[in-house]
C-alpha cells in the first residue's frame, strides 16, 4: 500500500489485497508470532463493537504487543468536549498504532492526516470498514477457492451498510456480478452504483428476496437493518424485518453457496439456518483474527516471515 494507514479499501491494489490474504492464511496456520514485541496499539472505539474490537485486540496480543484504549467514549475527555484532533494527537504520544471506530464518516481519514502514527479504520459511520472487507474476501476465497467471476447477493440495509460499500470496492478487481436486494428506503446509494458502472461491474437491483435470486448466488451476504442509523424510528419499524432468510429457501441453492453476515444479526437469518453447512458467518467472524493480524503487519511494515 502507498499509505501506512488503512482508512479505505480503495487504497489497496489487487496485489495488496492478495498479499494480505496470503499473509492471513499464514496466520491461520500459526497465529502466535511475536512480531509486535515492544509495540503498543490503541483501540479507540467511539461506537459500540464486539467482534471488531475483540479480534483486533486479540490480534495484537497474539502478535506479542500490548493494547490500550477505550470502548466507551463517554468515559474519555471527548465527553468533556475534547476534539478528535486533540484525542488523536494525545494518544499518538503513547502508541505505535491506532485502531479507531467513529460515527462520523471520514473520521479515520482525518485522523491519518493529523498524526504520523498509522491509523486502521475499524468503521467510520456508513462509509467504510476495510478490515471487515479483508476478512470477507478471505472468507470468500477460502470457501470458493477463488475470488474471480463470482455472483454475490447483498441483502438488507444497503444504504447505511458500510460493509457492503467496502466489499463492492474490494471485489471490483475480480469481475463479480452483484444482486442488490433492499427495500426502496435502503437501496444501494448512487455512489456505489456509479462505482460499479465506472468499473464495468454487473449488478441488478431487487426489492423482493426470492429463491430464484438465491439459486443464482455463490455468496449470500446478509445484513441487519441498523437501528442506530435511523433518525425516524417509524421508518425503522417499517423495514426492520423486511427480509428473513429461512432454511427452506436454500433447498435448491448451489452446492458452493455460502452465507456471510458481518454480524450482529437481529432477525434477518432464522436460527434454523445455523445448522446448514452453507452457513458460514460464525467461521467468517473467526477469520477476522487472521485478516486483522495481516493488516496490522502490513501497515507497520513488518514481514511475517521474519
Swiss-Prot record:
Phylogenetic lineage: Bacteria, Pseudomonadati, Bacteroidota, Bacteroidia, Bacteroidales
GO annotation (BP), single: amino acid metabolic process
EC number(s) given by UniProt: 2.1.3.2
UniProt binding sites for L-aspartate: 80, 162, 224
Name assigned to this protein: Aspartate carbamoyltransferase catalytic subunit
GO molecular function, one term: aspartate carbamoyltransferase activity
HAMAP family: Asp_carb_tr
Protein family membership: Belongs to the aspartate/ornithine carbamoyltransferase superfamily. ATCase family.
Function: Catalyzes the condensation of carbamoyl phosphate and aspartate to form carbamoyl aspartate and inorganic phosphate, the committed step in the de novo pyrimidine nucleotide biosynthesis pathway.
Pathway(s) it belongs to: Pyrimidine metabolism; UMP biosynthesis via de novo pathway; (S)-dihydroorotate from bicarbonate: step 2/3
Enzyme class at the top of the EC tree: transferase
Organism name: Parabacteroides distasonis (strain ATCC 8503 / DSM 20701 / CIP 104284 / JCM 5825 / NCTC 11152)
Keyword line: Pyrimidine biosynthesis, Transferase
Catalytic activity: carbamoyl phosphate + L-aspartate = N-carbamoyl-L-aspartate + phosphate + H(+)
Positions with a binding annotation for carbamoyl phosphate: 51-52, 101, 129, 132, 263-264
